[in-house]
Amino acid sequence: MFEVFISRCSRYFAISLFFLLHFEGDLSWDAKAEVGSLRPDEFVNPIGEGADPWVIRDPHQPRYLWCMSEGNQAIAIHVSDSVSSMGKKTVVWEAPADGPYSKEVWAPELHFVEGKWRIYFAASDGQNKNHLAYVLTAVGEDPLGDYDLSGPFATGEGQDGRSPNLWAIDMTVFEHEQKLYAVWSGWDQVDSDRQYLYIAPMDSPTSLSGPRVRLCSNDDYLWERVEPVKSKRGLNEAPQVFMSKQRLSVTYSCGASWLPTYKLGMLELTGDDPLSPASWTKRKDPIFTGTDSTYGVGHSCFVRSLDGRQWWHVYHAKRDRNPGWRRYVFAQPMKVGSRGLPVLGSPVDSNTIMLRPSGSKQHVQPTSMDDYEYFGHHQMLRATPDSIRLGVQPNAPINTYRSGEKVVFSGAVSGDFEVGVTMQFHDGASSRDAGILFRTTGPSIGYDALRGYFAGLVPRTNLLILGKMDGMNWQELYRREVDIDVTQPVRLKVSVHGDRISVGLNGQEGFHFHDSTYKSGSIGFRVVDADATFSNLSVH
């Protein structure tokens, strides 16, 4: 088991009332890349890797529950105490090896409906044309426990919805005037590949009670089409319901999810009957579009801060401009307009310093080896109570990319300390590097996306190195040639006394270096184009 000793820990300052009031109603933030550690009440985007993010506040305790697809073959729930972090994950359901819902598990959403936790998702037999909507219902009260499957929902034509049953993804549910409804993205006919938004009443959380109704056309405006020309088809998907001030609206993603032009549109319920298309009014312009630096934005959800004072907008964005689905997750504050409609502003840039949501818990020290944040592709982490493996190459990769995978433990260590860990490389002498992060703040997705220090081993060049990062750039501080036997575990140690940093290997002193850029922060592990297991962590 891991053994963690803490000698000196920082005490976080409380967020001042001024910043709470300023942040609640203001969409501005500090975009400067400042030198030095971030404060405990600050973070940067992107907060994690993934697509189609969904997060909900637990009505029973002060925490957030994130629901995400796990390699398109399972569903995971992450638990965190802030919208600014996704937390540790637990896989709650795995698809069977074969059958109609064994593959392409997409866009799961966790809802608390009629006293039970339920997960709505889409799945297929491996052929996209066979996607249908399903629901999992928790067996007990624990959202991290076992679930029973129901479905598929009758999302097709005819009074029974099964004449025939038709393609459906991105289902979400909502209650309006004591009636339950489902909204989803579906095809108009078999094999059409034309996606529209549909709605149907529900007689229970696991069953639709009436025929589907198409809410609107998918190509009223050029910006809804996969490309903004009349010859291209329209595409509406990922509906999300927003309710505030007795107003109900539905945001939706449109355009092409694989292109940088993905964006959000909005429907407003302006009539009395949600099942009547005439009751919905479409906004003539998109409500959220990409920028030069943050693009391919969509599949949003909306959630309040733990103290209820702020609304937050969570969405995914593309990692690069090439066609495809490699994405990561952003979170930023939003406003609610005078009529109760969402006002989203513009996507924030990566590495922008932002205040954490009001009411977020402040970690004052590392609590356990189980209390960490992971930053990297979700399929490249393997964790047990005794070890953490980073850089794992999955057998069935889904939109994978390397990003300097890392874990950062909750709570900061300040003052003098010593940290050690045992590392085992799994990809031999070709490994680039792996090692210890310390005095780390502002971790994010990306090779050098943190502020703090890194001490590690480079097997391919037999080096012991020390460097620091400012959130975007790497600066090497010192290097020394060492003998590295990648077939055996190695023990890496870092000691910090004032501005003196000492790095050692296998019980032998390596080198010392003086630097005072970062004075406090968390510890963690990182790999760079490597596959390594970390175990036997000690912190004194």
PLM-predicted stretches and their roles:
Residues 34-36, 342, 346-540:
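Extracellular glycan-recognition regions
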Residues 234-284:
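Loop/turn-rich, solvent-exposed surfaces of beta-rich toroidal or solenoidal domains
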Residues 201-207, 257-259, 268-271, 335, ...:
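Short edge-strand/loop segments of extracellular domains
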Residues 34-59, 84-111, 144-175, 203-240, ...:
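Surface loop/turn signatures of beta-propeller and other carbohydrate-active proteins
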Residues 51-71, 106-130, 136, 170-193, ...:
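Hydrophobic core segments of beta-strands in well-ordered, beta-rich domains
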Residues 66-94:
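Beta-propeller domains
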Residues 80, 133-141, 196-204, 263-272, ...:
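Beta-propeller blade signature
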Residues 263-336, 504-532:
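Aromatic sugar-binding interfaces of carbohydrate-active proteins
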